[in-house]
């Protein structure tokens, strides 16, 4: 939003009054499509097929007018919705409005985030590495080795539409915008017959707006959860994110406590007293880990179920939240299989007369790379077949030799970079072998030569291309280990995000 600094210069006390007029600003939709102020490209076009026509805010105004004129909350007796409003272009029209909504309702969030950053600029400057995905793994290594039980929880979604709008009321105080947003959500949700279908279409066509609603819901849920956790714990949380102020927050907390246990807040604080409760969220899931007995984990499990059911009207079955022992459970976490194993350490004790060995058992977090899912991803991206045998990439034969090699090297480098924390390196060596041989087969196919002849011509140069950068990095970090193959784990603190579409050849980690 740096292209539009004028929107962020609004007076703090009046900023919410300006949100509704922004719906009719063409620059908002240019920002939504990341086209700057270029008015030759947008989805605000008259024809659904022609993407090069000029902006037409007449469509937006017409849609909003017709939405206000209709009674959208009336549903027929058989449960179906007769919706002539959207017509054949319902996906297009909903996308037009959702893109504008997404940018506009993000403005109050962005203003508060910027002000929060200004207050904590020095603290943020000291810890830029905490934004890396790999930064969570050293934390798990330090903490999980001392814990005993773990619950892997899927955060339920979607919530009720009115709950979503009420959640946004604490952020967006513009009544007109909220009213229009409520109308749009009801109209859009009722346009589809099954929940599964509308969620899929909503995610594909309106990912920015979908993520905004989801993040606001998660922010609300975690605000309550971490508030109770911090108040009930012997030690305050030091790694939780920034949660902004909202109206009547403490009133809601008190009401939630009454609904849950029917007692005062001091009782619930002692009810959940635990100095070793840890919470991690990632990719729509959360992890709860604790020490000693599973009794406390059971209490937190039912607390979460009641929180979702009574506060967000989302159904969640307690039986689907399992409590597992860390020593007997392998956690599929951000592309790694993680589990806690007992490692024996033998120490020789020498006295004047006797010497004896002491075997100490120590817990250690092991992280390994799941080789089969990686091979499946490479297979879907056409680097190998389903059995893991390398194949050529015919779509790349039109490129130059240097471009082909650079592309394969970049893919191999990204995979090695992200999975460098694996305790076992053999799976990574197999992935490198697949990519290297796929590159050779692609070059041989381009030059109409055999793989054997092409390898003889290249010699060891191609292998050096795939291994050079990793060797340089290790030589800088571990000078003593540079002369031999380093087998230890390395966590990089410069990976802010990854793409979840690991099977998509054009949108996965393989193309970065």
From Swiss-Prot:
Keywords: Chloroplast, mRNA processing, Plastid, RNA-binding, tRNA processing. GO terms for cellular component: chloroplast. Its main location: plastid. It is found in: Plastid, Chloroplast. It holds the Pfam family MatK_N. One of its GO terms (molecular function) is RNA binding. One of its GO terms (biological process) is mRNA processing. InterPro entries: Domain_X, Maturase_MatK, Maturase_MatK_N. Disulfide bonds: none annotated. Belongs to the intron maturase 2 family. MatK subfamily. Usually encoded in the trnK tRNA gene intron. Probably assists in splicing its own and other chloroplast group II introns. HAMAP family: MatK (MF_01390). This is Maturase K. It comes from Oenothera glazioviana (Large-flowered evening primrose).
